[in-house]
Regions:
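Long non-transmembrane domains of secretory-pathway and surface proteins
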Residues: 1-222
Length: 222
């Protein structure tokens, strides 16, 4: 099976070389004769575009954040569960809470942010704990879903804060959770982003894997 998210895939059929230019929304087929003197370009063939998957593998944080913000919280929960089941190591790199100082008082995921003197509750992905009552270790994507998003009906794409009593620096901002998740996904390494893109396509965008069979020779350029 040959899978390409972006770039160019070339393969030979008989005496001709066929090159697929693969990008967002479509690809074009090009036939090159043996002599290499002439190139014929066929009509454009459209693929079903997968916005979330594309934005992840190409590292477009702002576009990914905007696309995630339009995605339902319930779909995000399903995506997170898929990550936890198949690649929990990746989930440990997403929405990692931060300590208030040094290695103490990590943020603890909750339905709303409250980091007053007695609490370190956070509803923002990767939130920082308060000055006391914080966790002894970081919490990650799994806990963010379980304690903050729950069934997806709250805290997505924007987190909820406790209100006037909470510290001003942890006030919720529009689409803050969508932006934080997008940043963490884009910060993953190349292989991890490819895995995440596949899970996004499968769990949210209804993606399908396209197989190219009986390839006699291949070259991949990205």
């Amino acid at each position: 099976m040959l899978v390409a998210m972006e770039g160019s895939v070339g393969y030979g059929i008989g005496g001709a070389r066929v090159e697929l230019e693969i990008g967002y929304e479509r690809f074009k087929t090009k036939g090159i004769r043996d002599s290499g003197s002439k190139e014929d370009e066929a009509d454009t063939v459209y693929l079903l575009a997968k916005e979330l998957a594309y934005d992840v593998v190409t590292g477009q944080t702002d576009n990914l954040a905007a696309a995630l913000a339009k995605t339902s919280g319930k779909d995000i929960v399903q995506f997170a569960k898929a990550v936890e089941i198949s690649h929990s190591d990746i989930g440990k790199k997403v929405c990692k809470t931060k300590p208030n100082s040094g290695t103490n008082n990590y943020g603890k995921y909750a339905p709303e942010t409250d980091t007053t003197a007695e609490k370190s509750d956070v509803a923002i992905c990767g939130g920082k704990g308060g000055t006391s009552e914080g966790g002894s270790s970081e919490e990650v994507f799994k806990q963010f879903i379980e304690k903050t998003l729950k069934d997806g009906s709250q805290n997505w794409p924007t987190s909820k804060d406790k209100g006037p009593g909470a510290r001003s620096e942890v006030k919720s901002k529009q689409n803050d959770n969508a932006k934080a998740v997008a940043k963490d996904l884009v910060d993953l390494n190349r292989d991890e982003k490819t895995i995440v893109a596949g899970l996004l396509a499968k769990t949210i965008e209804g993606g399908e894997v396209v197989e190219i069979r009986a390839v006699s020779s291949t070259s991949l350029r990205t």
